[in-house]
Amino acid sequence: SGAAAVLLFLLTMALLGGLTAAAGLWSHSRLEELPALADSTWQPLPVREELPEETTVERAPTGDGTTLTISPLPSGGAHSLQEIYRENIASIVSIRGSKGDGMSLGTGVVMSEDGYIITNSHVIEGCGAVDVVLQDERVFQALLVGQDAQSDLAVLKIDCAGLTPAQFGDSTLLEVGDAVAAIGNPLGEELRGTMTDGIISAINRDVNVDGYTMVLLQTTAALNSGNSGGALINDRGQVVGITNLKMRAYDNTVEGLGFAIP
């Protein structure tokens, strides 16, 4: 019971001249830094104690926006993991945010055929410019449509048509025990398009982050730094959450405690 735990935003940071993975840490019980990882090229960021950094990414023209369409649950049985991957991988993108002397690296999900992308707000927090990398390795500079730190969501726009949008499902239909899969870019672009699977282990989980409460889905699907902004997908191939947090203990191993925004 004396174990201190922290919530990690699933964000990878790359310093120019050398790759370094890190995550912003939000203490669940006391503010501390995690010990350095065994590999000296990897290190954590310090605990966040200040207000969110201002994002200075160029904004899309006023009035630009899109509507997120929630599709009904398809008829028929559950899809195989192979089917879920094939149905969704084209909709998963990499997010590169220029930030001071480095970059933040995360994941995004295509919302529309004409270039709208959803990701986590903390992925682009403090960035001066953001690029989106598609699965075919094309790179587009993104404009910021909107961002909300408390919900930890942001919408970007790239000048590209013909994208493959994900199908979004109704997260209120989820039940504890439902099978889910997560697709994202753990530890950055070298491992982009990684899929893990698990179950929904809790619904409407209240998680205190930086003094306010987020109501999240809890999952056993493995999530790591770089998965921020990625897709949590139900067994019918629909995106039902945007992955953003995991829990980690200081003095014992915690596994299978990942979170997603419903």
Language-model region placement:
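Conserved positions in beta-strands of structured domains
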Residues: R96, V109-M111, I124, L143-G146, ...
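Catalytic-histidine neighborhood of serine endopeptidases
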Residues: G24-L37, S112-D152, I158-G162
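A conserved glycine-rich beta-strand in the N-terminal activation segment of trypsin-fold
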Residues: S75-E83, R96-Y116, D131, R138-Q141, ...
